[in-house]
Amino acid sequence: MPSHAGAPPSRRRFLALSAGGAVAGAAALSGCAMQVSSGVSGSGETVTLMINPDDLTPELIKQAQKDLGVKIRTVKYDITKLIAMLTNGNPPDLVRGIGAVDAAYFAARDVAEELDPYFARSSILRLDDLDPVNDLWRYDGRTQGKGPRYGMAKDFSQDSMYWYNTALFDKTGVDYPSETEPVTYEEWLDNAERLVQRKNGQTTVFGGSYNGLGKAILLTSLTAAAGGNLFTDDFSQVDFSSPEARKALGWYIDYCRVRVGPSIIDPDPNTWDGPTYQANRMAMSNCGYWLGGLINTAPKLAEVSRLAPAPVFEGGPRISTCQGGTGLWMPRKARNKDAAWRVFEWFFGEAPAKARASGGWGIPTLKSLRSLMPAQEEHQKQVLKVQEAELKHFSVASFTPYAKWEGLESIFNQIAPAAMRGDMSVDTLARRLNSAMNEQLKRGKEQVG
Amino acid sequence: MTVGQISSAQGGTDTAKAADRPAAANRPRISMNARRQRAFYMFTSPWIIGFLLLTIAPMAYALWLSFTTFDGISPHWRYVGLDNYRELLSDSVTWDALGRTGLFAITSVPLSIIGGLGLAVLVNRPLKARGLFRTLLYLPAVVPPVGAGIAFKQLFDTNSGATNGALNIFGFDALGWLADPYARYVLLMVVLWGAGNIMIISLAGLQDVPRELHEAARIDGASAWRTFRSITVPLLSPVLLFQTVTGVIASVQTIMPLLLSADATTAGVTAIPQSNYQYMMHVFAQYFAVGRYGYASALLWVLFVLILVATGLIFRFSSGVVFYNVDPEAKK
């Protein structure tokens, strides 16, 4: 029946029109959403950086826009937003990432751009000036550390080293660790038990914190320090039952069980060591050189803070791993790759890189910037001396490309607390971790192909 | 303009009016009912378009994802049919999380309804400063959940929280409130702390109970408890049913454990104490920590169906005990 002009639509027609409107609206929204890197006529291009707010100051951005003639737009790093932007086909031009665990993951999924041609013609980021830590951002389709470069680290630390507070050592009569010879992990734990201060069931001073940058990469590093590999040669499986991985896992579970520092079963409300260490409530903190950036801002704390070499396992090799190597990568579908590269060069080789190097927030990733590391004060000289000696033992613990580090960590977080409370043996924990993590890795390998 | 011109102009206008008349007469007349319908659709269309765009479309997309191995990043995902749903049936972590969520719902919903109703009864009495009490008791309900989470984390922190400070004063050792086995009790306390919402709705219901019925019962010698049980509760039963349904839906979807966690990051959320690792936490972890968008979408769809079933069951079993002042069948 033809509808009368002016008559109200039928219910069915109205719903159909609404659905049509919704689809049209969705299409319009999709077109409008996340418009990045569109050319800006007359004032250069726009480059979108997905970074943390403290990665770049507004002043540096303003200066860069002036110097490079490129408009820089920043978006706060958020994995859900990144996925939405990648899915939408409008990714940021440069994205923050942790080289040790993200580089191979993104490269294996074909979403990261190979940067070798850009490096080859760069006069700012010369290949012979790159610190070996940047190899964390290389991946040859099988192994991290080889093959094309997919990103670069902005700075780095050897994340198994630790800071200690001499005042708290003095108070409990514990000897300072050597500046040149590492303690064993067992000695470190023994010291932490002597340094911890408790009252009425409350911990007033943590003896030591040892949690690495994340449990998955920490356990990878600890296993390497015990002389083994957590992953099989093709990175498709973990093996916590090997003597070395079992030793590493057992040590970490012991650390949590004796409750000398923050852990899953004793969470620190500050979520990281910085504020607790700054408040003189932590005698040892497993943070690498980068924590110096925070310590240098508090002169009283700096006076009593020292950096110590990474511990070793009895009979294990002396290695000192980098668990982070945080930097930037360029999505394959970035719109303004050439402009993004100009920003990339500036971020890693010019003003921001110099500011990071002189602030003590990590070791510069260009050898030519090493001379800017802070060394004016006595304590800074001590820290630099220890750090320079430690660089001889620099090592990388390769990570699997088949799983997100958070995914492997989620399995650990679900299963391990029982072992930390003494309700499960370490051998049972190792078996359960193998089973659950290998299933996740198998799915990832199928996905990557 | 001369008189003749004016007259001519007027004549022209009249002619135009006359010519318009038949067109206006031909225009279909809109009945009042049709006008009402049109107004109804005009006023509801923003909501309906929003509903289609922001609810139905994402749900349909999530349903499609639940049949795939999509991980949010890789272009190499594939269609796997019902595999994600099959896996879900044998995933012990999912079942454990679902069990904890169910236990939380059957504990927290009755406790908050009883607590809210109790508070409503108290502030419905002729007290001095009744308005002040009502405001104070309702205040927690207007605190944003994130603020409540931060406040409770500070309050129950093992080493610096006021709760352990108070325990120490009375000679007790500090407890690890935010870890197992105590974390579940803190979660329950946060939920009960916000019972002001239930109090307000119950209070409105209480004020609708006819006073004459209470007076008649009193004259007949009924005790206060008997009056409450036999008059107040039956008359409040539709309100209680509403609170039960919305309470169950809210409790199975709660994200409060996340807000109470020490580290509310993608990886940190998976470190939530086991007793608080509820279904939505598992969904969150599967989406963002593990990156299994397909599996997590299947989890969400199963939850959606379970909520529908639970709501249906609540309506089915409440039909004999909910008393409607107005016959709900009257308009059928």
Model-derived features: where do they sit?
Chain A
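Short, solvent-exposed loop/beta-turn-alpha elements that line the ligand-binding surface or hinge
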Residues: D116-D131, S178-E181, K199-N200, T204-S209, ...
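Extracytoplasmic/periplasmic substrate-recognition and gating elements
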Residues: K66, T87, G250, D254-V260, ...
